[in-house]
Amino acid sequence: MSSNIKSNSVIENSWAQLKQLTSARIALGRSGISLPTHAQLKFQLDHAQARDAVYFQLNVSKLCADLTQSFSSMNLESIGLQSDAIDRPTYLKRPDYGKRLSQISKEILLKRITKAKFSPNTFNYDIAFVIVDGLSALAIETNALRFLKTACTNLQSEKFTIAPFCVVEQGRVAIGDEIGELLSAKLVIVLIGERPGLSSPDSMGIYLTWHPKVGLTDESRNCISNIRNGGLSDTEATMKLRYLVTQAHKREISGIALKDETSSKQSLSSLNSFLIE
């Protein structure tokens, strides 16, 4: 009798079959006039995981060590940096602080550049990768190293010169502009933890900017978002990244002037969804 009561207590939504196609919170059904208990508990869990992702602290020294070891064959080093936001509460309350390097970090970067003895008034690198914790350090810890292995291997055939990896704590997207300008890189590629969603606390985004410099705004950048298990795969993201990087160098543009013309229709058709004809 108790099993009958349990099975009849939740009224299923007619869209329930669509739940297999998305992790979004749809077709939850109802129990009386409320959500089913399992749906309410799942919401609370997802909300807690999203909050935890915001306050998750990136282990910068470990990531730098892992990057240096993984890319030793390419002779790429890693540099740990800090934004002007001294802690997480400051970072959340003052977004502008996350857009600029702290004075100490700026000096560290300048010393590295001086040591390299680059020629003045020339570009030192074709590409500068900047890895930033953003609003989800969990996303960077989960995805950044794995993705960079795929991306750098794919880009290696293009013979681009790559700057030392810069790993930034308490940073925003725009901090890549300052770093790219200091390194005198033609193109900066920022990997950053995106704002956690209720179904994706570990989503990583990528922002590309041609001729980075302090003061640029969003229309100057291209974005590839939702890179994670269950989102955009490393292979698909790398395909998009390679196209944008090669086109940016060829045409010397980025942002709204540069469109991603990789075949999204082909990628979507591989999902075998009846919603995509």
Pin down the residues of each PLM region.
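Active-site loop/lid in soluble adenylation, ligation, and acyl-transfer enzymes
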Residues: S2-E107, S267-L271
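Alpha/propeptide regions of enzymes that mature by internal proteolysis
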Residues: D52-E77, N143, T150-F165, D234, ...
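A generic structural signal for short, non-catalytic loop/turn and secondary-structure boundary residues
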Residues: F71-L76, T122, P201, T217
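Fold-independent oxyanion-binding glycine-rich loops
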Residues: S83-D84, V132-G134, V168-Q170, L191-R195, ...
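Short, acidic Gly/Pro/Ser/Thr-rich loop/turn segments
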Residues: I86-R88, A137, G197, G215
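Conserved mixed alpha/beta catalytic, RNA-binding, or beta-rich assembly cores of soluble enzyme
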Residues: K99-A116, T122-V130, G134-V188, S199, ...
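C-terminal functional extensions of proteins
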Residues: E194-E277
